Every structure is written in structure tokens, then in C-alpha cells.
Curated annotation (Swiss-Prot):
Pfam families, A to Z: Adenine_deam_C, Amidohydro_1
Residue ranges, annotated region (Disordered): 1-31
Biological process terms in GO annotation: adenine catabolic process
Catalyzed reactions: adenine + H2O + H(+) = hypoxanthine + NH4(+)
Keyword rRNA processing in record: no
Native source organism of the sequence: Methanopyrus kandleri (strain AV19 / DSM 6324 / JCM 9639 / NBRC 100938)
Name of the protein in its database record: Adenine deaminase
EC numbers, comma separated: 3.5.4.2
Cross-referenced HAMAP family: Adenine_deamin (MF_01518)
Domain of life: Archaea
Assigned keywords, A-Z: Hydrolase, Manganese
Length: 599
């Protein structure tokens, strides 16, 4: 595919105003509600003068303008004063080798998916140049409702100078009764309580596609005009007229693109297009093959587990885009300027009044090697981040593991088919044999979901795609209601895995006969309070048990955690049963196609 327009850069936007999506706004300006003014509690006052200011001297880049400029980037405390060609009179000047860039902004994350508390998450990503994220905390909010949202917003205050901008969860529960057992609920009245908070920047992803098109989410969408919030979309599989209907209702972004057709559709509609590269969804390759440029594009990690943070970061994603032939400034824009414009942030640019978050790289090339990171006007290694304390509920498993059973026989069943590298699943109909409480067919395992909220509900089905899984894997991270999910070929192992959760509470783990390994998730059954290195070590012990008992050499937990999500096509299992998910309809379907054993 020809891409001759890439290397030339796009020039000054004042000369080319069409580069941004329709309805784009200038940095620091909300869609309708006016400027995004961060109160003095969150940004130091601009000094009248003195000797407290500091400046970098060297080459710098703000993607709003074309090319690399030379001069001074000046800040005082945690706030940028601006850039200039002239040496400042009242500033401590630091000569810099390399290129000075704005701190990177991840436009869509679920911090809970890291398995870490937010402060520990921030410590890791800031080393790679990420100084701000737009956090949709709907994982913890699904578990604990308004209490979880209050904790997230309080954490956004406590964690400064790291910026946890908040997207207000708009679909909690994602689906709810009768399709799944849930605990948390966020009504629009609850959302309004937090909508004017200075760290709240958007209405979180609107996952109820049919509800959006039918006007059932209008009250949440109206928060856009009432509070000047961006509205985040979630439209997997929608193209053509259906995509038009959905985005015409109000959503402005989409992070669910995973096919060339979807990426093309979003660009044609002028929707902010997010490209995911995380632990679960890896859409970068398709995006780089499809997109002609990166105007209106943001790179995001979405769900990124601690074990993958050494390999996946915004810095490396930008480098990959440059290596693929995209213009370096456009690639940098996808983690700086574009998120800033999309959400009206005071991050992502080197302009007066914005946060003094600065990244220095050796060059804008495929390596994007970091030489320095400053956050809130301080070197990152000198900053310690905090998060808020809260009594968030742990897992309450009331199902007796001995109750979980399935009659021996040969059946034609609907299997939840895994799609490697994607959170989507397929409906696969096939014959299977259950004998002595074990599935005898290659690449098929039992799938069991029990509620975590003490209601005692559970269901059993089948999953295809875990290969020769010869143990049981269990997780209390199960999107989005976070009930307990287990996969295993033998019911004895499945029961032992449920017993493990009953004994230790929230965790991810593996059980093979008498052996068990797990990572304790003591914060809402989603996150660990332990040191990140300890979490990674325990997680590796779990994976080693899976490898040694099964020969499975890939991480099954990201796939396992999404087989329960009943708002993404095509087939999902919840604690209430098997759910068929289509763009215009969600319904229960039978696990056994004819209701009786074949033999």
C-alpha cells in the first residue's frame, strides 16, 4: 500500500486545519463547557518572578508544529511557563542532549487490569515516559459501585504529579440481570456527583451499543454538554450505517477496532480512533497496515498486565509506528497532542500552563530511547506516588465446589471459541465426550463461572482454544462483573480451583492435582498490594505450573478473563448461562444444541 505522504510531515495546523477530526478542540478546551481549568489545588500558581524557575536548553518538539526547534523549555514547580528562543533571565538552565518531548499520555486504560494498585502502576509506566493516563475504573466500580468510583477519584488526587484523568463509567453493570449477577451500579445521578471534578474528563466507554442507538443512554451522553466531557465509544463489529447510527448518538472515540474495515470506518466517520496494544488486544499490526496516517489516532494499552509492562509501553509503540514508516511527529502525536485535544487535557504539549511533564529521547526513531523523564517538574526517580485507601470488598464465594458437575456422555455443544490476540470469541459447535468427569477431546475444556457476591449462582459450559490444558486455571478477574471463572479438562481440578478461591479470596491461580500456585489479589479481588516484582514472580510461578503440567507455553489468563464479557461478540459464559452476543441482540442460548446426549 502506497504511503508516500508519511515522511513529509503535516505542516503547521494553522495552514492545514483539516488534519484533525471534525469537532476537534484546542488543547485545554472542553467540547462545550469551556476551558479545562485545573484549580490551584492541582497546579501550582504561576510565580511573579524570582530564581525558582528551571529550563531545558536543547532541541524540543511540540507536535502541534512541524519540525524540531531549538531553544529553552521553562517551568516553575509543576507548571510549564513556555518555550522560547531566548535564554531566560531567572532560571536554572540544564543543557540537554537529545530531543525534549511532552510526557506521554495513554488515552484509554483500565489500571486494575495491571494487577497492581494505581501507585505501583504509575511507578512502572513513568519509567517508560508515560506521565498521564485516561483511566476508566469500571473494573473496580463493577465490584464496589459508587465506593469504587470515589476511591478512583480520590486516587487521582493523591497520585499527583502522575495524572490519572478519570473517565466516568457509563455501563456499570456492562449488561447485568438477567444475564449475569452483579453488585456495582452507576446511575447517571451518581455520575453527576463526580462530573465536575477537575480530574474527570470523559464519560466512559458506552458498551451498550443497542441502548445507545435506541436513546437509552442519552442521560449519560448529555453530560457532554452539561460538563464539557468527551464521550467514549465502544463499538466492536459496527461498520456502515450501524456505525453511523451509533456515533451520531454521541460517542466520539472508539478503542475497539480490530479489523481493517473497522479502522477505515472510524477514520471515514471522523471518530477519534484508538489503536490498542496491550496484554489482551493487539491491534497494532492491523492498524499499521490499514491507516495511511495517524491524524486523529491515539495509541493506547487498554488492559496491560504487570507481566507485560517490560515489553509493552507507549514509548515502544511509538517506535514501532516510526519503524513501519509513519511520520515521527504524527507517531509522537498519538501519545501527546492527540489525547490532549481529544480530552481537553493540560498534558501532552509544551505550552504555558500545562503540566511540567517532560520526556527526553535520544532521537525520534524506531528505538525512541529515553534518557530522562521529568514529572510535575521533578526527575521521575525522585517522585513517590500514592493512591487512596479504601475498604473495597473481596470475593465472597458461596458456591459449594462439590455441587459443580456434568453428566458423562457424548454431546453436541456450543463452545466458546478463543481468538488469539483478541478479546472477541467465536461460537463453535462440535461433538465432545465427557467420561469420568473429564473432557476427552483435544483443545476443549470445561468452563465454569460462579458469582462472587454470595448469591450462589453458577453455570458450566465448554471452551475451545486452551490447547492441551491439563490443569485448572482460575481467576477472580472476569470482565466486567468479575465473578469467578475457571477452565479445566477435569472437574476434580475445577473444584479444587474453586476451593482455592474459597480459602484465599481474590486471586489468579492454577491447580494441577495436589499442586497449586496463585497470586493473591487482596484489593477488590482485582489488584495486589504487593511489590510489582513480587507479583511478577508469583505470576511466573503460576505460569510455570501450567507449563509443567500441560505444556501450554502461553498465558491463558487474559483470554480467561474475557470469556465472561457479555457485550462483545460472539459467545460468552456468565454465572447465569451461555450468552450469544450480536450487534443488535443479546440472548441466552443452550449449551447442548439438542438438549440430550448424542449417545
Amino acid at each position: 500500500m502506497a504511503r508516500s505522504n508519511r515522511r513529509g510531515g503535516r505542516g503547521d495546523p494553522e495552514d492545514d486545519p483539516a488534519w484533525a477530526p471534525p469537532g476537534h478542540r484546542c488543547a485545554g478546551e472542553r467540547a462545550v463547557g469551556g476551558p479545562t481549568v485545573i484549580p490551584r489545588a492541582y497546579l501550582p500558581a504561576v510565580p511573579a518572578g524570582g530564581n525558582e524557575s528551571r529550563a531545558f536548553q536543547g532541541r524540543f518538539v511540540d507536535p502541534w508544529f512541524s519540525g524540531i526547534r531549538t531553544g529553552y523549555v521553562i517551568w516553575d514547580g509543576g507548571r510549564l511557563l513556555g518555550v522560547t528562543r531566548n535564554e531566560p533571565e531567572h532560571a536554572d538552565v540544564i543543557d540537554v542532549d537529545g530531543i525534549i518531548c511532552p510526557g506521554f499520555v495513554d488515552a484509554h486504560v483500565h489500571v486494575e487490569s495491571s494487577g497492581l494498585r494505581p501507585a505501583r502502576y504509575a511507578e512502572i509506566v513513568v519509567r517508560e515516559g508515560t506521565t498521564a493516563v485516561v483511566w476508566d475504573p469500571h473494573e473496580v466500580v463493577n465490584v464496589s459501585g459508587e465506593l469504587g468510583l470515589e476511591w478512583a477519584v480520590k486516587t487521582a488526587e493523591e497520585a499527583l504529579p502522575f495524572k490519572f484523568y478519570i473517565a466516568l463509567p457509563s455501563c456499570v453493570p456492562a449488561l447485568g440481570p438477567p444475564y449475569e449477577t452483579v453488585e456495582g451500579e452507576i446511575t447517571v445521578d451518581v455520575a453527576r456527583k463526580f462530573a465536575s471534578h477537575p480530574m474527570v474528563v470523559s464519560v466512559g466507554e458506552l458498551m451498550d451499543v443497542a441502548g445507545v442507538m435506541e436513546g437509552e443512554k442519552d442521560e449519560f451522553i448529555e453530560l457532554k454538554s452539561l460538563y464539557g466531557l468527551t464521550v467514549d465509544g465502544h463499538a466492536p463489529g459496527l461498520t456502515g450505517f450501524e456505525a453511523m447510527r451509533y456515533f451520531a448518538a454521541g460517542p466520539e472515540t472508539d478503542h475497539e477496532c480490530s479489523t481493517a474495515e473497522e479502522f477505515t470506518s472510524r477514520r471515514e466517520l471522523g471518530v477519534w480512533t484508538f489503536v490498542r496494544q496491550g496484554s489482551s488486544s493487539k491491534d497494532m499490526e492491523v492498524a499499521l497496515e490499514t491507516l495511511e496516517d495517524l491524524r486523529g489516532v491515539c495509541f493506547v494499552t487498554d488492559d496491560l498486565h504487570v507481566k507485560d509492562m517490560d515489553e509493552i509501553s507507549l514509548r515502544k509503540i511509538v517506535g514501532r509506528a516510526i519503524e513501519a514508516g509513519f511520520d515521527p511527529l504524527e507517531s509522537l502525536s498519538a501519545v501527546t497532542l492527540n489525547p490532549s485535544l481529544c480530552y481537553g487535557l493540560q498534558s501532552g504539549r509544551l505550552v504555558p500552563g500545562f503540566h511540567a511533564d517532560i520526556v527526553v529521547v535520544e532521537d525520534l526513531d524506531e528505538n525512541m530511547e529515553l534518557t530522562d523523564v521529568w514529572i510535575g517538574g521533578k526527575r521521575s526517580e525522585r517522585v513517590r506516588f500514592r493512591d487512596a485507601e479504601a475498604e473495597l470488598p473481596d470475593v465472597e464465594l458461596s458456591v459449594d465446589p462439590r455441587e459443580v458437575s456434568f453428566q458423562d456422555g457424548k454431546y453436541e455443544v456450543r463452545c466458546v471459541g478463543l481468538v488469539r490476540g483478541s478479546i472477541r470469541t467465536e461460537e463453535i459447535v462440535r461433538e465432545i465426550t465427557v467420561k469420568d468427569g473429564a473432557v476427552k477431546d483435544d483443545d476443549v475444556a470445561f468452563l465454569v463461572v460462579t458469582d462472587r457476591y454470595g448469591q450462589g449462582s453458577w453455570s458450566i459450559g465448554f471452551v475451545e482454544g486452551f490447547e492441551e490444558l491439563d490443569c485448572a486455571v482460575v481467576s477472580t478477574v472476569a470482565h466486567d462483573s468479575h465473578n469467578v471463572v475457571v477452565a479445566g479438562r477435569r472437574l476434580d481440578d475445577v473444584r479444587r480451583a474453586l476451593q482455592l478461591v474459597s480459602e484465599v479470596g481474590g486471586c489468579v491461580g492454577a491447580v494441577a492435582g495436589d499442586r497449586a500456585e496463585f497470586v493473591r489479589l487482596d484489593v477488590a479481588g482485582l489488584m495486589s498490594s504487593s511489590d510489582p516484582e513480587e507479583v511478577k514472580k508469583s505470576y511466573e510461578d503460576v505460569l510455570e505450573l501450567i507449563r509443567s503440567s500441560s505444556g501450554v507455553d502461553w498465558d491463558p489468563f487474559q483470554a480467561l478473563s474475557f470469556v465472561t464479557l457479555p457485550v462483545v461478540p460472539e459467545l460468552r459464559l456468565t454465572d447465569r448461562g451461555l450468552v450469544k452476543v450480536e450487534p443488535d441482540e443479546i440472548r441466552f442460548v443452550d449449551i447442548i444444541t439438542d438438549g440430550d446426549p448424542v449417545e
